[in-house]
A protein has these predicted regions:
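Walker A (P-loop) phosphate-binding loop of ABC-type ATPase nucleotide-binding domains
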Residues: 35-39
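Helix-to-loop junction immediately C-terminal to a conserved catalytic motif
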Residues: 48
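Conserved ABC ATPase "signature" region
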Residues: 96, 100, 107-125
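Catalytic Walker B motif of ABC-type/P-loop ATPase nucleotide-binding domains
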Residues: 154-158
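ABC transporter nucleotide-binding domain
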Residues: 170-258
Length: 295
């Protein structure tokens, strides 16, 4: 199974949202990382065949998805950033409605819905109106509808938005299990969503794919550029002004442990440390504030 993206571009008036993207996806979990505005959502929508590209095409096992039409869509699951629903739908009503739209046999609908409700901790609210649910619960309903047809290709745009830490962990574990013999593409700017479950990652910047590889392959480019050191707490404001500090932790005796990015040591006593995918993300997108992005 293969999903091949060839020379895919999307132009909106005088803005190029996606520019000549080439990417071949094989089974496993793929992370699509990029800051807000990088073009991730536009790319997702073209892969989902709900937006027509200006140039290029997407091929599923060698066939253009626009020609495959319903055959492709029957194998596809999609979670957009925002999904629509009738305000009076209960969770169960909505999932039954979506199952009917996806031509899932009636005899299979109830057990499939019950399984997803259980996995996504929605069983207790299945009779509640979606409009009355919290943002995190609505997100989980959206995830459930994307998985109803047991898709071979699952694309999720910011799947953990609004989920609490425990829900994020459960979802990551579920996705990891689900991905066997399937293509799962997760578009996110929350690096922890995919750092430990992705088979490969694609980095998107200004509408282009700038790098592709496993986490281990990608972080090699910042080896020797991630530093740890301990400083007096009184020195922290000055260091924050001149360094790219990506983490800090208070220690005993008015000391602060900091982790920072730099081509070379900036503070006496600094030692290099093993880079993570989050470090690479912040290296590539220096204006990103992870806490603000996470919200």
């Amino acid at each position: 199974m293969e999903l091949k993206i060839e020379h895919l571009s999307k132009q909106f008036k005088d803005k190029t949202a996606v520019n000549d993207v080439n990417l071949t996806l094989i089974p496993g979990v793929w992370g699509l990382l990029g800051a807000n505005g990088a073009g991730k959502t536009t790319l997702m929508r073209m892969i989902a065949d709900i937006m027509t590209p200006t140039n290029g095409a997407v091929y599923y096992d060698g066939k253009d998805i626009r020609e495959l039409g319903e055959v492709y869509r029957s194998k596809f699951g999609f979670l957009p950033q925002d999904f629509g629903y009738h305000r009076d739908f209960t969770v169960k009503d909505y999932l039954e409605y979506m199952a009917a739209l996806k031509d899932i046999p009636t005899r299979a609908t109830t057990p499939k819905i019950n399984h997803l409700l259980d996995i996504l901790s929605l069983s207790d609210v299945k009779k509640k109106k979606i409009s009355n649910l919290s943002g995190g619960m609505k997100r989980r309903v959206g995830i459930a509808q994307a998985m109803l047809n047991d898709p071979e290709i699952l694309v999720m745009d910011e799947p953990t938005a609004g989920l609490d830490p425990g829900e994020r962990v459960r979802l990551r574990n579920f996705i990891s299990e689900f991905s066997h013999d399937r293509i799962v593409l997760i578009s996110t700017h929350i690096v922890s969503d995919i750092e430990y479950i992705s088979t490969r990652n694609a980095i998107m910047k200004a509408g282009e794919i700038v790098d592709v590889g496993t986490t281990a392959e990608l972080v090699k480019q910042i080896e020797g550029k991630v530093w740890n050191c301990t400083i007096p707490a009184s020195k922290l404001p000055e260091c924050e002004m001149r360094l790219r500090i990506i983490n800090q932790r208070g220690e005993d005796y008015n000391q602060v442990s900091i982790r920072y990015l730099s081509e070379h040591s900036e503070i006496d006593g600094s030692v290099t440390t093993e880079p993570r995918l989050e470090d690479l993300y912040l290296w590539l997108f220096p204006q990103t504030d992870l806490e603000k992005e996470d919200r």
